[in-house]
Amino acid sequence: MSTALASAGVISGLEAAAQENIVPFQFKDKSSLKILGTNWGFEGTTDEFCVAIKKEGYDGTEMWWPGTKEKQTELFSALKKYDLEVGFLCGSGERDYATHLDAFKKQINAATTEFDRKPLYINCHSGRDHFSYEQNKAFIDHTTEASTKSGIPIYHETHRGRMLFAAHITRSFIVKNPSLRLTLDISHWCNVHESLLRDQEETIKLALSKVGHIHSRIGHEEGPQVNDPRAPEWEATVKAHLNWWDAVVEQKVKNGETLTILTEFGPPNYLPTLPYTN
């Protein structure tokens, strides 16, 4: 089984821990919760991937916006064939700021206008951690405009190396940009701050109130991904993540909003491997 699909096994293995986090709220119906699978680490074709996640019971997938018409046709054909939803990931790796921003804008513009199946949302790897506030704000301004025009929710991911790489930095962005919406991958912050964030409770509470989408990976104080969340040594870490996610779920239920969750478990070598085996 590929690492992309192993997420399903890991999530099912967390049932015991989740049952201890009994909460007095639940979604009204299945359509209010969309569980998506990642193709990160999957080595087959798009069609093969869609077959696999459909079989595992996923509602859809999150993928990078396809860069060519051929890839777009391939993806949208598979989504239609297997009746799957989609969320798009947009971002840029260019070093030069102007080039980086331009590439990002082109992806956002394409993803909000050139689709055959309207995405549930767009998730952004926005800016860089070393760009200035004003430089990074340009990414927020563009996505705000694009979201308003298209009606597609656009979220900015809490991701290392990107604009929202740390909790306190994100707080500053939220205070200055109250309409900012987040994709919560809090595993990154556990790594960045080398903690389970107990010393930033008010900041985390503010961030959770802005979450539209979740990446459900479990990080820890020394890395962005535990080796196996079912292992007893990660019990406290798993519970911390479940509590953060439950806070988002409670908010979504209260507001009558749909929640999307991407199950994510990084492949080798993101997942550490034995020395001398690669």
Residue ranges and their predicted role:
Residues G41-T46, G60-E74, G93-A103, R128-Q135, ...:
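Acidic-and-aromatic substrate-binding clefts and catalytic sites of carbohydrate-active enzymes
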Residues S92-K106, H130-S132, F139, Q225-E235, ...:
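Surface-exposed, active-site-proximal loop segments in enzymatic domains
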Residues I22-D29, D47, A52, A110, ...:
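Histidine-acidic metal/acid-base catalytic patches
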Residues M1-E20:
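N-terminal export signals
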Residues D96-R181:
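Active-site acidic/histidine proton-transfer and metal-coordination neighborhood
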Residues I22-N39, T46-T68, K105-S132:
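Long, low-complexity, intrinsically disordered polar/charged segments
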Residues D29-T38, T61-M63, L84-G91, L120-C124, ...:
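Hydrophobic faces of well-ordered beta-strands that scaffold small-molecule active sites
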Residues F25-K28, C50-K55, K69-F88, A103-K118, ...:
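Acidic (Asp/Glu)-rich catalytic clusters
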